[in-house]
Amino acid sequence: MSKPLCSTGLRWLWLVVVVLIIDLGSKYLILQNFALGDTVGLFPSLNLHYARNYGAAFSFLADSGGWQRWFFAGIAIGICVILLVMMYRSKATQKLNNIAYALIIGGALGNLFDRLWHGFVVDMIDFYVGDWHFATFNLADSAICIGAALIVLEGFLPKPTAKEQA
């Protein structure tokens, strides 16, 4: 017998949509208003910089001949499916876990869209200190990192007792 979807973590799927809209919207604005390599300073230590990433985080495997596009697309799909199953199995009241899963799914789908549509991931956030620049990233990457950090944080928090879960 299936359980009502609103009682599961799938109730938090609206957050996936929010992450996707913000991520894809920001990438659209960059693609419409920047040429590849253009940079605009926002604040000290923060630029908007249009870059293309053909690999994964930190351009891992970016120069591997194209197969990595499909490899990373497959990983993104697999992770999304696993996290959706985990959301379905969790209670809607398990907020921290479900928010984390939704952020990761939204970020993974945003980058998956880029890989499938453009053949690369659009990156635009350039954080730097002095002459040292961190790897350029996007809002999907930020959502994935925040989601992963929330999962780690949840591991350090005390587990609710059976009475608190009821």
From Swiss-Prot:
It is found in: Cell inner membrane. PROSITE patterns: SPASE_II (PS00855). Keywords: Aspartyl protease, Cell inner membrane, Cell membrane, Hydrolase, Membrane, Protease, Transmembrane, Transmembrane helix. It catalyses: Release of signal peptides from bacterial membrane prolipoproteins. Hydrolyzes -Xaa-Yaa-Zaa-|-(S,diacylglyceryl)Cys-, in which Xaa is hydrophobic (preferably Leu), and Yaa (Ala or Ser) and Zaa (Gly or Ala) have small, neutral side chains. GO terms for biological process: proteolysis. Pathway: Protein modification; lipoprotein biosynthesis (signal peptide cleavage). PANTHER family: LIPOPROTEIN SIGNAL PEPTIDASE. This protein specifically catalyzes the removal of signal peptides from prolipoproteins. This is Lipoprotein signal peptidase. It comes from Salmonella schwarzengrund (strain CVM19633).
